[in-house]
Amino acid sequence: QVWRVNNFDTISLLKACNQGCKYATNSMESLYPHIKSKDLRKVIDDYNTQHIEIGDKCHEMLNVVHADEKDPKPMASMFAKMSIDLKMLADSSDEKVAELMFDGCNMGIKTVGKCLNKYTSASGGSKGIAKDLIDVEKNFANNLMEFL
């Protein structure tokens, strides 16, 4: 597959998708200790794997043009982890885990959707990855509904 990847919009979109995948996997992994239901754990495991796979695709495409990945800012990651930990202190139920993940899905859909609208000159391959990520977020949210 040939990508027209060497332009600002393509690189920016791939970095945004990659960063979003990292935020998602970091959040899922920080919630693992709180999950009691095997069914919820399986859903989260499945979608964690899908986020890792999409992040890997972004990484591969960014490597083609020697562009660095965009990691979540350390302070933002620390704040997100602390926020999750505080929310789980107040309510450590599987319902709360599902609610936090559901909110994250909606944030991901909104953020990646905005990036798709902003980076209109991005390559078809990078737009495809962004759309795949949005689909993963929508499906994840739908699968979380039964745990809310």
Q: What are these model-predicted stretches?
A:
Residues 3-35, 96-120:
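Alpha-helical bundle segments that constitute or directly flank the non-heme di-iron/ferroxidase center
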